[in-house]
Amino acid sequence: MSNSEHANFPRAGFFRRLGAIIYDLLLAVAVYMIAGAIGFGIFTALSSSGLLSMNGFEHVSDLLNGTPLYKGIYQLWITLCVGLFYILFWSYGGQTLGMRAWRLKIQHPNGQSLSMITAAARLIWSLLGIGNLWILINGDKLALQDMMTRSEVVVLSKEANQMRNWHGV
């Protein structure tokens, strides 16, 4: 089944999207924790090697919490990792793992996949999921992020959900 054939599937409603959001939230927390551990490891390695001054702090965690610049860099790193989780899944297959479980796919109305830039814009416009509330008052089942990025979330058939949506896979 080509991507253009995905253009004929119905749009997803609020509760199906909410189910996928809950699944994906668990995965995003895992990505957050892994990114945090990697970032903490990098700061620990930099301070142990002497490339990063401890500025009188005894522990790296104190350094991260007590220095606004380092705390900002650390939080930016974690936020970028979680954001990339969504951007990569949305642009290279149209589905996160939570969306796959609920048979949802993000695409343009013609069935084409989102670019990484469109996926990033969609992430920003989703307002941490609050943009989905627009579906409750919009008869077209379009969320705020759908309208702003000219995309849609569709419900795939069981057969279409079994196919490999990833580019080159």
Language-model features, listed with the residues they occupy:
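Hydrophobic alpha-helical transmembrane segments and immediately flanking/interface helices
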Residues: 104, 137-164
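Short, small/hydrophobic-residue-rich motifs at membrane-helix boundaries and re-entrant hairpins
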Residues: 1-127, 156-169
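Glycine-rich flap/beta-hairpin and adjacent strands of clan AA aspartyl proteases
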Residues: 129-139
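Hydrophobic side chains within alpha-helical segments
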Residues: 20, 27, 125, 135, ...
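Membrane-spanning helices that line or support transport/gating and their immediate boundary helices
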Residues: 37, 41, 45, 136, ...
